[in-house]
């Protein structure tokens, strides 16, 4: 592929373990790369991607579509315009049983590795809220996981053979504190039955926003008035109509035809289309 004339960009959508060698090879051949999440699995490999991109002067983008979700983009704009006041805490997660989407390589990786093995859908959007690596950075974390109550059972179902042990717990929770004293709660669970959730939540001194299980927002009367919303009781959440008003007001300024096309091509509201548009 890299030897073909006219190829400027290579998408890497393979198993996690092969992301880095493929991406590095493509950049060394003078091709920019877009790498599926997670782009790399170790700090050594992360630095290898960074070093290669800088040495070859090629773009290397991790394809994290969750940061292009309509709700996440609108809340990010609200936060940066101060509508929630000072942000103090954020949450994100990746939780739903992946069922028939299990592949042998992914199951084997989970058998061998503990911790949050798929964190970017959750941590990507909330890092943007806190301006991580812009005005703040992560300082330290505490993480724990449950036992693998379903791991061996799922391994048997996917792999067709038994295993004596399974390293990845059913639920992983990670608490991160930033240098500026903000906190992040990141969760991962693809084993137990539950509705899909990325647990997106922003907690500020003047407001609150959360996407799951249903969109919720709460604003002070002063902040709500800035966008023409009347709040009679600041102890009550906004109604659905008021939330929609906010989402429209703070929506990214894509042309209407782009938004229509994104929704037609992407059943999840267009977030993958908007992500790909960055590479056009």
PLM feature segments, named:
Residues 110-116, 161-163, 188-189, 258-267, ...:
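Active-site rim elements
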Residues 120, 165-170, 178-179, 193-194:
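A short catalytic or substrate-binding loop motif that flags glycine-/basic-rich loops and adjacent residues
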Residues 8-9, 15-16, 20-68, 82:
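Beta-strand-loop-alpha-helix segment that lines the small-molecule cofactor/substrate pocket
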Residues 174-180, 202-204:
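Active-site beta-strand termini and strand-to-loop segments that position acidic
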Residues 13-14, 187, 192, 204:
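Short, well-ordered coil/turn residues at beta-beta hairpins
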Residues 127, 195-204, 210-213, 219-280:
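C-terminal helical cap and adjacent loop that interface with cofactors, partners, or active-site loops
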Residues 56-61, 66-166:
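Predominantly a Rossmann-like dinucleotide-binding segment in NAD(P)-dependent oxidoreductases
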Residues 1-8:
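A structured beta-alpha segment of the ubiquitous adenosine-cofactor-binding alpha/beta core
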């Amino acid at each position: 592929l890299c030897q073909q004339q006219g190829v400027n960009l290579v998408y890497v959508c393979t198993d996690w373990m092969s992301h880095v060698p493929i991406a590095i090879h493509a950049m060394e051949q003078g091709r920019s790369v877009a790498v599926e999440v997670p782009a790399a699995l170790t700090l050594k490999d992360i630095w290898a991607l960074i070093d290669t991109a800088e040495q070859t002067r090629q773009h290397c983008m991790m394809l994290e579509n969750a940061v292009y979700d309509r709700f996440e983009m609108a809340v990010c704009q609200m936060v940066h315009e101060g509508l929630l006041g000072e942000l103090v805490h954020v949450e994100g997660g990746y939780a739903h049983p992946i069922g028939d989407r299990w592949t042998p390589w992914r199951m084997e990786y989970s058998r061998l590795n503990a911790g949050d093995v798929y964190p970017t859908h959750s941590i990507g959007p909330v890092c943007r809220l806190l301006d991580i690596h812009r005005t703040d950075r992560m300082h330290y974390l505490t993480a724990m996981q449950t036992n693998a109550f379903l791991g061996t059972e799922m391994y048997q179902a996917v792999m067709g053979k038994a295993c004596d042990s399974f390293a990845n717990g059913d639920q992983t929770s990670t608490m991160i504190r930033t240098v500026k004293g903000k906190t992040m709660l990141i969760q991962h669970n693809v084993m137990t039955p539950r509705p899909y959730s990325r647990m997106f939540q922003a907690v500020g001194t003047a407001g609150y926003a959360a996407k799951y299980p249903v969109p919720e927002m709460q604003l002070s009367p002063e902040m709500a008035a800035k966008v023409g919303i009347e709040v009679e009781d600041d102890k009550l959440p906004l109604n659905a109509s008021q939330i929609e008003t906010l989402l429209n007001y703070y929506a990214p300024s894509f042309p209407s035809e782009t938004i229509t096309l994104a929704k037609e091509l992407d059943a999840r509201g267009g977030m993958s289309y908007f992500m790909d548009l960055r590479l056009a």
